[in-house]
Amino acid sequence: MKVIFLKDVKGKGKKGEVKNVPDGYANNFLLKQGLAAEATNSSMKTLEAQKRKEEKDAAAELENAKELKETLEKLTVELKAKSGEGGRLFGSITSKQIVDAMQKSHKIKLDKRKFEMDDAIRALGYTNVTVKLHPQVTATVKVHVSEQ
């Protein structure tokens, strides 16, 4: 019997795949558990439409990420912090503080986990911070830390 997997089934198939499985296994396990649906013409058309929609959504997401990259590359995020001698900060600037500053000054909301910082910023001046917007799109944001 031909079935369309609705969920991943270990050793049999992944979600969205169409496979031939034994009738008994399909009727007694896959269909009853809601792990698969019978592959009829209408369900195949639905699956194709769903795949096209997912591709379209992924393309739109990539386009949005590219537009956001263009915006971020032009920005400079201004932060103020207390510092000691030699431009060393008392404390550090974290990705959370950068996100908050971007939200306040530029009305851009990002997740702090998207910032790829090896370590927090601990010195005055300009620092380039990498932001992973999408698996294929990364942007660089300039962060300017000045003395308070």
Swiss-Prot record:
One of its GO terms (molecular function) is structural constituent of ribosome. Gene3D superfamilies: Ribosomal protein L9, C-terminal domain, Ribosomal protein L9, N-terminal domain. GO terms for biological process: translation. Keywords: Ribonucleoprotein, Ribosomal protein, RNA-binding, rRNA-binding. GO terms for cellular component: ribonucleoprotein complex; ribosome. SUPFAM superfamilies: L9 N-domain-like, Ribosomal protein L9 C-domain. InterPro entries: Ribosomal_bL9, Ribosomal_bL9/RNase_H1_N, Ribosomal_bL9_bac/chp, Ribosomal_bL9_C, Ribosomal_bL9_C_sf, Ribosomal_bL9_N, Ribosomal_bL9_N_sf. Binds to the 23S rRNA. HAMAP family: Ribosomal_bL9. Belongs to the bacterial ribosomal protein bL9 family. This is Large ribosomal subunit protein bL9. It comes from Bacillus cereus (strain B4264).
